[in-house]
Amino acid sequence: MSSKEYYRNHNFKRNYGINTEEYVTMFLTQQGVCAICKQPETFTIKGKVINLAVDHDHETGKVRSLLCRNCNLALGYFKDDVENLQEALRYLKNHNSNGLFIG
């Protein structure tokens, strides 16, 4: 195992309680796409596409799925609050493409 692989495996274990093999299994099960938007990760750092983020419940630490950066940040901004997410959904449904309130 290279030092890069060791470091990656160590971080998965420390941060999420999973190893690299479990991450790869999740990645393959999800066919390499985000569990929410069903798109592959596109965000890059220094020209390299980053890995899908390991999404987890911040209260329990339980790993949920792999998400792209945008979806992971969105859940974070909503603090994983289902009611706030439902309100955001209602808000979007109640406004048409012209931005006029229709509800």
What does each of the following model-derived ranges do?
Residues 1-53, 58-62, 66-103:
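Contiguous alpha-helical segments
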